[in-house]
Amino acid sequence: MTNIRKTHPLTKIVNSSFIDLPAPSNISSWWNFGSLLGACLILQIITGLFLAMHYTADTTTAFSSVAHICRDVNYGWVIRYLHANGASMFFLCLFIHVGRGLYYGSFTLSETWNIGIILLFTVMATAFMGYVLPWGQMSFWGATVITNLLSATPYVGTDLVEWIWGGFSVDKATLTRFFAFHFILPFIITAFVMIHLLFLHETGSNNPLGIPSNSDKIPFHPYYTIKDLVGLILLILPLMTLVFFSPDLLGDPDNYTPANPLNTPPHIKPEWYFLFAYAILRSIPNKLGGVLALIFSILILAIIPLLQTAKQQSMMFRPLSQCLLWILVADLCTLTWIGGQLVEHPFIAIGQMASILYFSLILVIMPTVSLIENKMLKW
């Protein structure tokens, strides 16, 4: 008798994706982050759903409804902080996932990589709109500053901003539409994730050596399901530590003050996971130039496959490229730190140097060093 798992139309899809999927035998723990991202997405959707049951998207009651969730709803504070810190874990996994793709040359799977970039933009948009919902000072002013960037668009800039605001300033209409988009986008993200997996399973996964692994495959279950579960437990530990011991560690104290359009905070800054892009934006004195640099700082990932000059796909046996990638990581950490500092000397200069280094590394230095490494193969 044939197994229902392999014959039923629904279970057949699950079976070919997560059970009998042929996977390379040598993929390391760096490949765990895809499944961790899936777990984070599920956590965000579930906690978000429960928060939406008690939240009101109205400027007069939004702030107090969040306070009500934390004070009066059974375990509301746990749900709220799981959602807020879950977003931080989501982005941490995202950045590592992208970094692993760069290190091991996974960007050569172009469809999977491009859908991944679309996913990154969508998740960033969702997180930004979610940050506006508690309607604290940083929520309001963050929304004002970031949406105002669109006014740099030639000809239609002002109309575009007013269209997004639903008026002449960030107000009730803005909050309502941000809540609507914040609610629907995770489901759109889920659809994109399915397409991402579809394209990945068309080609098969990459591996640390960057060589074809068709000659040596193992079933996904039980080997990688157990491995992913270990990763999940190791992710839950820091998340729970954050939620139960210092839930506001990654937040901004200004967001515990209700939004006040008449009082600007001394330092407007987004959540930590946007600070690198925010630092790049601020390092350019021109408004339109800053906006373009901000967009290009993430969109640059799309042209990385075109800049691949190395003969080896993976960086595993390319020590110079490895060194440069870790310099890039250090540079991004520097940008993240700068994004959280005041706009004054010496932070302005450091931010500008770090921004120049970021683009130089990706566009010029790394492709050049890859060519040098190609020459070194003949020595």
Curated annotation (Swiss-Prot):
Heme b b562 binds at H83, H182. A ubiquinone binds at H201. GO terms for cellular component: mitochondrial inner membrane; respiratory chain complex III. It holds the Pfam family Cytochrome_B. It comes from the Eukaryota. Heme b b566 binds at H97, H196. It is found in: Mitochondrion inner membrane. The keyword Transport applies. SUPFAM superfamilies: a domain/subunit of cytochrome bc1 complex (Ubiquinol-cytochrome c reductase), Transmembrane di-heme cytochromes. One of its GO terms (molecular function) is ubiquinol-cytochrome-c reductase activity. The chain crosses the membrane at residues 33-53, 77-98, 113-133, 178-198, 226-246, 288-308, 320-340, 347-367. The keyword Electron transport applies. Its cofactor is heme b. CDD domains: cytochrome_b_C, Cytochrome_b_N. Belongs to the cytochrome b family. Component of the ubiquinol-cytochrome c reductase complex (complex III or cytochrome b-c1 complex) that is part of the mitochondrial respiratory chain. The b-c1 complex mediates electron transfer from ubiquinol to cytochrome c. Contributes to the generation of a proton gradient across the mitochondrial membrane that is then used for ATP synthesis. The cytochrome bc1 complex contains 11 subunits: 3 respiratory subunits (MT-CYB, CYC1 and UQCRFS1), 2 core proteins (UQCRC1 and UQCRC2) and 6 low-molecular weight proteins (UQCRH/QCR6, UQCRB/QCR7, UQCRQ/QCR8, UQCR10/QCR9, UQCR11/QCR10 and a cleavage product of UQCRFS1). This cytochrome bc1 complex then forms a dimer. Heme 1 (or BL or b562) is low-potential and absorbs at about 562 nm, and heme 2 (or BH or b566) is high-potential and absorbs at about 566 nm. PANTHER family: CYTOCHROME B. This is Cytochrome b. It comes from Indri indri. The gene is MT-CYB.
